[in-house]
A protein has these predicted regions:
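Ligand-binding pockets and gating/stacking loops
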Residues: 1-428
Length: 428
């Protein structure tokens, strides 16, 4: 029997916004136009945020964070020093290297998931795919555990940029990621239609309110209440003073250039602006890591320069503003790539050993957890599991990893599977 889900694989931003553009809620419009009282800096003193930099396709540890220059398959790239003594990374990441006082590397992550979809699911939820249940993504967990505690906050608690993000699963549609498909483009339907004046909007609000209230009273399932809550949140967002964080047209040209004008650079800049306003979770995706051929030219001409500029600027800005103390940053992908270079000058799927980078939010910087052998093949020190990473992220966000949820069908599910514990080396 399949687990009863409140929501399927997610709700598109188009559906989320389009219907609100021609309808509204049964509450006085003035209430939604009232400015928020919370100051962003005060908000951030007591609340944590997480930014996940998602590298879809499976990035190579051998060419980023765990170089093996002595190996026959070490590749073309050379290691360079970072701000952390003894920690070396790729020569094509010099800006990120300067930020390693606040970043650490896990070099011994491993799993059995070498398929893109399964690996993506595993890394986002901490659980291997199971046909009987859709687990909640970490962003939705952060929204549920932390975002709901923010009163009068009109932006979404979970936002995905350049990606659809991971489903909220059994947590319901109110915690499904709000999707920004292109951070360089205006978000469609963020404002009411020009031909809908205030009086017309109020009439629609009353009508929708009657329909929604009757729908909920008829007890048509938990999803009916979620549906109303989503519309409520959306309308408040349309009139929020914090909505400009989702727009980059007013950002100075020099600042745009520091991050890069591409979708990933702009996404990282938007992520910083969102956490400055108190958004709990933002994921920014950079695809193109499935390098089965010509990996060295592809990386040095494309993804690595983009990553270096955007990630370097992001960590630098969070550090200078002090937000790094309350903002967890995680760089990760679905799995790694083979240490051995194939006949097409590429690397293939490799879940046996790979690296992720983590920092901020109370994580100690300049650390290296785990190690692979001289060829980057086998883990020779401190193997780390995906559930351990999930537990570590939860702890950094102030969430108890052992927290247990009960799905609508009564199934107990913990945040971290297999009794996984946080990686203590990153906290002491």
């Amino acid at each position: 029997m399949y687990e009863h889900l409140i929501t399927p694989e997610g709700m598109s931003r188009r559906h989320f916004m389009r219907h609100l553009a021609t309808t509204a809620l049964a509450v006085p419009a003035a209430q939604f136009m009232t400015a928020l009282t919370a100051n962003a800096k005060e908000l951030k003193k007591n609340n944590k945020s997480c930014i996940v930099l998602w590298m879809g396709g499976g990035p190579s540890h051998m060419d980023t964070w765990d170089l093996k220059p002595e190996s026959d398959h070490g590749g073309e790239f050379k290691p360079i020093a970072t701000a952390a003594p003894g920690v070396m990374i790729s020569e094509h990441l010099p800006k990120v290297a300067k930020q390693f006082k606040n970043l650490s590397i896990i070099r011994s992550l491993n799993s059995k998931e070498g398929n893109h979809d399964r690996g993506t699911y595993f890394m986002h939820t901490g659980y291997q795919p199971n046909p009987t249940v859709v687990h909640a993504g970490f962003g939705s967990i952060c929204s549920y555990e932390l975002g709901e505690k923010l009163e009068n906050f009109d932006l979404p608690h979970c936002i995905a940029i350049n990606t659809a993000g991971q489903s909220a699963g059994f947590l319901g549609m109110t915690h499904t990621p709000f999707v920004v498909q292109d951070p360089n483009a205006p978000i469609a339907n963020l404002l009411p239609p020009k031909d809908v004046n205030e009086m017309r909007m109020e009439r629609r609000m009353r009508m929708l309110g009657l329909v929604e209230n009757r729908f909920v009273k008829e007890k048509r399932g938990i999803a009916s209440g979620d549906h109303k809550a989503v519309y409520d949140k959306t309308f408040r967002m349309m009139n929020s003073q914090y909505t400009p964080a989702l727009k980059l047209d007013s950002v100075a040209a020099a600042e745009r250039d520091r991050y890069g004008r591409g979708s990933f650079g702009s996404g990282c800049l938007m992520a910083r602006r969102l956490v400055e306003q108190g958004v709990t979770f933002v994921e920014v995706a950079l695809g193109g890591w499935d390098n089965h051929a010509d990996i060295f030219n592809t990386l040095k001409r494309g993804n690595l320069p983009q990553l270096d500029k955007a990630m370097g600027a992001l960590v630098e800005d969070l550090t200078s503003s002090g937000l790094i103390e309350n903002t967890l940053i995680v760089w990760m992908g679905d799995f790694g790539r083979t240490p051995k270079v194939n006949q097409n000058s590429g690397r293939d799927h490799w879940p046996n050993s790979w690296s992720i980078v983590i920092g901020g939010g109370g994580i100690k910087g300049g650390r290296v957890v785990g190690a692979t052998d001289k060829d980057g093949v086998d883990i020779v020190d401190r193997p780390v599991s995906v559930p351990e990473v999930m537990a570590t992220m939860a702890k950094a966000m102030g969430i108890d990893p052992s927290t247990q949820y009960t799905t609508p069908r009564g199934r107990p599910i913990k945040i971290a599977d297999e009794g996984a514990k946080p990686i203590k080396e990153l906290f002491s």
